[in-house]
Design a protein with these regions (language model features):
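Residue-level detector of conserved, well-ordered beta-strand and adjacent loop positions
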Residues: 55, 61, 107, 122, ...
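Phosphate-coordinating loops and pocket residues in cytosolic domains that bind phosphorylated ligands
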Residues: 3, 62, 90-91, 99
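Basic, Lys/Arg- and aromatic-enriched nucleic-acid-binding interface segment
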Residues: 12-16, 31, 36, 40-86, ...
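Conserved beta-strand positions that form and line the central face of beta-propeller blades
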Residues: 4, 59, 105, 137-138, ...
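Active-site/catalytic core of tyrosine-dependent DNA strand-transfer enzymes
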Residues: 122-169
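Amphipathic, well-packed alpha-helical segments that form the structural scaffold of globular domains
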Residues: 3, 23, 27, 58-65, ...
Length: 171
C-alpha cells in the first residue's frame, strides 16, 4: 500500500518530500510495536538544470531598470548582496540597514539558514536607496511587504519582453 502512494508524483522533488514524510510515519509506527514493515522507499535523483551565464549583466540590469524599478533593486540586491528575493529582499525594512546604508543586518528568523547575517551593500546599490521610516518596507514604503509572488510575477513578465535575456538564463 505505502509503495503506491508516492507513485502519483512525476516531479522527483515532490516524490522525495512525500517519501520522507511517509518514512518518518512508518518507521515511528514500526519502532512502537505496530505490525508494519519498515519503509523501503528509495529517493529519486533530482534533475539539475544549469543556467546559462549572462554576457551583458549591466545591459540586462539597465533593461530591468526601464521595465520595473522595484525588480531592478531586487535584482541588484540578489546579484550584489547575495540575498534571496522571495523572502529576504521582499521583506526588507529600513531598520535592517545600517544608518549609512553600508550593511544589511538580517536576524536568523528572516533567513533560510536561520543564522544572523550581516551583508555589505556596494556603493552603486546604496546610490539607489532613499532611506525611509525604520518600520517601513523598502519597496512599499508602508509596514506591509509586497505579496509573496510579486517578484516571481514581475520577473516572468520581464522575461517575456526582454530583448537580452535568453532561454535558461536568470539572475
Amino acid at each position: 500500500f505505502l509503495i503506491n502512494i508516492p507513485s502519483k508524483y512525476t516531479n522527483n522533488t515532490s516524490y522525495n518530500t512525500a517519501r520522507r514524510h511517509l518514512n518518518v510515519l512508518v518507521n515511528y509506527l514500526h519502532e512502537h510495536g505496530f505490525d508494519i514493515q519498515k519503509s523501503t522507499l528509495k529517493t529519486r535523483k533530482q534533475n539539475e538544470t544549469l543556467h546559462k551565464p549572462i554576457n551583458d549583466v549591466k545591459g540586462l540590469l539597465d533593461e530591468v531598470y526601464c521595465f520595473n524599478k522595484n525588480l531592478h533593486l531586487c535584482c541588484l540586491l540578489t546579484y550584489c548582496c547575495l540575498l534571496r528575493p522571495h523572502q529576504e529582499i521582499r521583506r526588507l525594512k529600513w531598520s535592517d540597514f545600517s544608518e549609512d546604508l553600508k550593511t544589511i543586518s538580517l536576524s536568523g528568523s528572516k533567513v533560510k539558514s536561520k543564522r544572523n547575517r550581516v551583508v555589505p551593500v556596494p556603493l552603486y546599490v546604496r546610490e539607489l536607496l532613499i532611506k525611509g521610516e525604520p518600520h517601513h518596507n523598502i519597496f512599499t514604503h508602508a509596514t506591509r511587504p509586497l505579496n509573496k509572488d510579486y517578484f516571481k510575477t514581475v520577473w516572468s513578465r520581464f522575461k517575456r519582453v526582454s530583448k537580452l535575456l535568453e532561454q535558461d538564463q536568470t539572475l
